[in-house]
Every structure is written in structure tokens, then in C-alpha cells.
From Swiss-Prot:
Subcellular location: Cellular thylakoid membrane
Taxonomic superkingdom: Bacteria
Organism: Microcystis aeruginosa (strain NIES-843 / IAM M-2473)
InterPro entries: PSII_Ycf12_core-subunit
Protein known as: Photosystem II reaction center protein Psb30
Subunit details: PSII is composed of 1 copy each of membrane proteins PsbA, PsbB, PsbC, PsbD, PsbE, PsbF, PsbH, PsbI, PsbJ, PsbK, PsbL, PsbM, PsbT, PsbX, PsbY, PsbZ, Psb30/Ycf12, peripheral proteins PsbO, CyanoQ (PsbQ), PsbU, PsbV and a large number of cofactors. It forms dimeric complexes.
NCBIfam families: PRK13686.1
Function text: A core subunit of photosystem II (PSII), probably helps stabilize the reaction center.
Family note: Belongs to the Psb30/Ycf12 family.
UniProtKB keywords: Membrane, Photosynthesis, Photosystem II, Thylakoid, Transmembrane, Transmembrane helix
GO biological process, one term: photosynthesis
GO cellular component: photosystem II; plasma membrane-derived thylakoid membrane
Encoding gene, per UniProt annotation: psb30
Broad class of the protein's primary localization: membrane
């Protein structure tokens, strides 16, 4: 458990969250365009 505590999880979670947002943005735009472009 000490090794797990040594890994600082907060920046890892933040990087994962930012990566999800960066991937979700274009995905939502692509999905809207694919469904006909109407919001």
C-alpha cells in the first residue's frame, strides 16, 4: 500500500479527466454531424 500511496494519484486523475474532455469534444461534434447536424 505504500507504493500505491507513493504514486500521487491526483495529477493522474486530472490528466485522465483532461484527456477525456479532449476526446469527448470532437466525439460529440462528430456525433452531432453524423446524426444530421441539428442541435
Amino acid at each position: 500500500m505504500e507504493l500505491f500511496a507513493a504514486l500521487n494519484l491526483e495529477p493522474i486523475f486530472q490528466l485522465t479527466f483532461v484527456a477525456l474532455i479532449m476526446l469527448a469534444g470532437p466525439f460529440v461534434i462528430f456525433l452531432l454531424a453524423f446524426r444530421g447536424g441539428d442541435l
